[in-house]
Structures are given as structure tokens and as C-alpha cells.
Amino acid sequence: MNSQSINHEIQIEPLSTRVMLHPFLAGMNHTQLTLLTDCAVARHFNANQTILREGEFANGFYLVETGKVALESEAGFDESIPIQIVGAGDLFGWSWMFPPYVWQFTARAIEPTSALFFYAAILREYCEKDHSLGYELLKRISAVMVTRLQAAHDQMLSIHSSRISREPLIAEAPLLKTGNVRV
């Protein structure tokens, strides 16, 4: 086998094609995808490699192409608490959008993972200039945030379910009075 056929077999898609084909960005227009490509770099992570750490500066976001990433919380616990596992087609790292730009979770590759990384500083500038880009990203990232919040909520309830009292938090709730009738 000569070197030309080897290069053909392992040919990698151009970054612009990878951005355009990522499911998270489906339906975005050509101009928006071009701006996103301008902010993007390809990244690869080994199994068990920490990608980002909770509490550190959020400098961008990731779109997973292959592999799996565990999102974990370390805040207030002796060990990391798994929140959610994301894989191909998913986004993680939405904290770049909102001051103070601090990661809300730790992300760790569970297996070898390829992702597109988008630099926040450049992207925020583009979003300020092109509000349609900012709005498209906000709509998509908001949906991810809701899912992530629900996953964190469910996980915390699961962890603390044995400690949660089934009794009301206040021993005697105040009674509402309507005339002489107590409701």
C-alpha cells in the first residue's frame, strides 16, 4: 500500500464540514456556520482525561463528535457526583454564555472522545454583532440547560432520598381563614 492510499483512507473532514454536519447546529444558516467555524478547533481527549473543571473559567463550549463524556459535580461533596453522560451530537460547557463565566460541572472523558471546541471570547463578539447568531445559540443552549438542570435535580434527589423527610417542612402550616371557615 503506498502513502497516497493511506492518506486517502485516513482523510479527515475539513473543520467547516464537521461544524456544518454536527446535529446540534442543524438548521443554522451558512453565515452563522461560517462564524462558528471561525471560532472552532478540533480536540481529542483520552479516557479519564479531565476536559474542564467545575469552578474554573469557562472559555468556550464543546460539541461531541465521538466518545462519551461524564458531567460531574464536585461542589460540597467528598467525591464527584455523576450528573449526566453526553455523547456524539451533544453539547457541554454552556457556562461561557453567562457572567461570571465559570464552569458549573466538571467534564471527564469516559472513553476516547473527539469534540469541536468553540472559543467563547470570539463567539461572544460575533453574537453581539449578529444577534440572530446569539439568539440561535441561546435557543439551543437553553434546551441543554433545562435538560442538565433536570438531570442534576434527579441525581441530587436520588443521592439524598434517604435523608428527605416525607413530613412537611413546617410542622404546622398556617391556616387560611375565610370568614369563620378554616380552609
PLM regions: where:
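Cytosolic regulatory regions built on CNB/CRP/Popeye-like sensor folds
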Residues: 1-183
